Amino acid sequence: RRQRQMCIRDRAFGETVHRLRKLGFAVDGAAVLAAAGGKLPTLELVAEVMLSDAAYDTPLLAPYREGGARGDMPYINFYLDYGAQGRPAFVPVDFMDYRDAVALIRDNGGVPVVAHPGLNFRGRERVAERLLDFGAEGLEVFNNYHDTTQIGYFAPLVQRRGALMTCGSDFHGKTKPLIGIGQFRFDDRFESYLRASAARLLVLP
């Protein structure tokens, strides 16, 4: 299964490079793979490679340089602008079935919780209820992406379902330099339920 997923990702990366080149970026796939060092080559890494070498310079990169409109967090902004779902370099990847992923997490002693569902399913937040139906044990309700409306939807949903409520900053180091560890939007009304969820996690088998 792991080998199959790696092959799928390799093909997707090749198609991503092809699409970026068609858009006008002088992407060198081999250079990105070398920088990845055997790890997954992400769009954030593509941006880092291009922004760190004048050989890749193009006016298309200007917004992501220091002082540019998207230069505050250039790597993740590049991904959001070009690689996110619906963007011009997005390549659909056929990952494992969701229920198989849930089973795999449980089989290895983990607890399946959906991270930042409001970011992944913006405008389709009700998908989160289906994810709980099919095995997720909780939702990340508080983070740096969910607005007050989304929090107002996810928090009561988790409470009604008796699911786990979690929080997270989504800190990614240099990829998201404006996000610090432990910093996230929060609503004090749900503190007691969040603490109860944390206590449950400590005693789960």
Predicted regions and their residues:
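Residue-level signal for secondary-structure boundary elements
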Residues: 14, 28, 58-59, 91, ...
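Residue-level detector of short coil/turn "hinge" positions at structural boundaries
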Residues: 27-29, 57, 138, 165
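Conserved acidic, metal-coordinating active-site core of Asp-based
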Residues: 40-113
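Conserved phosphoryl-transfer catalytic core
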Residues: 9-43
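Short, small-residue-biased leader/transition segments that mark boundaries at the very start
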Residues: 3-8
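Charged catalytic cores and adjacent phosphate/nucleic-acid-binding surfaces used
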Residues: 96-110, 114, 118-205
